[in-house]
Structure formats: C-alpha cells, structure tokens
C-alpha cells in the first residue's frame, strides 16, 4: 500500500496518457486506493471533487500560473505546489500549503508533511483569510491605489 492508512488518491490529469498511470497503479497494488479521472470535469461537478479531497497536489515541472490554485482557494483546500513559475507567489509556503522542489522526493515529502498533526485544518483556516487577496474587492482597491499613484 501507500503507507497512508485509510487514504485514497484521486488523479485528474488530461496531459498524460492514462496507460502510464494504470501501469503504475497495478505495479504497486494500489487499485483500491486510487481513483483515476481522465475526462473533462464540467463546471457544475468541480465542487464535488474539491469537497472530497484533503488537499490538492500540483506536481508541475513547468508552469506559469494554475487555475486549479484559484479553485482550491475558493473551496479552502490546502495545496502542495512545486516551485515553478508563479505558483509560489500565490501559495505562501507553510500558510495554505507547501511549496516544494519539482522532484519526486520533494513532492513526496510535502505530501507526508500535510499529514503532520493539524496541518490540513490549519491550512484550511488560513485559506479563508489568504483567498481575500484574490477577491474583486481587493483587486479594485489595488487598481484604485495604483491609479492614485500614477495620476
């Protein structure tokens, strides 16, 4: 098994051929622990996925930003993101999730740390405050401040 007793993993990936995952799942005897979703998820169903998970892992090797991050904020779901592109700018390390090296070991270590004590719940609570940075109200306030500075 995975070593995480009573845990399941839900994978949503539209970029990697599913055969690769199916082979890894079978080779490791994880058929009862992994749910693979390799199809488009309509907007009206997204809430079910984010409500069912303890946290989101975005193990990108390269990225700029991620729409998944903003959705995770909306549902107050903690995150593990790799330190690529601008992800570390929108996921403060140790506050709403962990920013890790874009390596298998880096991601694995960050996932394990999520299960330390009350980390997940603490990150969920921090997310309530942190997500305000991305609200329309905050954006309008910052635009108005910028306008006043350049006027």
Which residues does each predicted region cover?
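Conserved acidic donor-binding segment of nucleotide-sugar-dependent glycosyltransferases
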Residues: 93-104, 112-118
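Nucleotide-sugar-dependent
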Residues: 60-70, 88-89
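Single conserved hydrophobic/aromatic residue that forms the stacking wall/gate
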Residues: 1-11
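Acidic donor-binding loop of glycosyltransferase active sites
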Residues: 48-64, 77
């Amino acid at each position: 098994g995975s070593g995480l007793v009573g845990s399941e993993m839900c994978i949503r990936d539209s970029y990697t051929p599913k055969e690769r995952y199916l082979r890894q799942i079978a080779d490791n005897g994880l058929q009862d622990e992994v749910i693979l979703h390799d199809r488009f998820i309509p907007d009206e169903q997204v809430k079910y996925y984010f409500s069912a998970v303890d946290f989101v892992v975005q193990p990108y090797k390269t990225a700029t930003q991620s729409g998944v991050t903003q959705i995770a904020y909306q549902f107050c779901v903690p995150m593990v993101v790799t330190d690529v592109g601008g992800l570390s700018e929108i996921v403060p390390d140790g506050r709403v999730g962990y920013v890790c090296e874009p390596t298998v070991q880096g991601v694995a270590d960050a996932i394990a740390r999520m299960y330390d004590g009350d980390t997940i719940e603490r990150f969920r609570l921090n997310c309530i405050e942190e997500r305000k940075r991305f609200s329309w109200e905050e954006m309008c306030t910052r635009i108005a401040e910028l306008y006043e500075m350049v006027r």
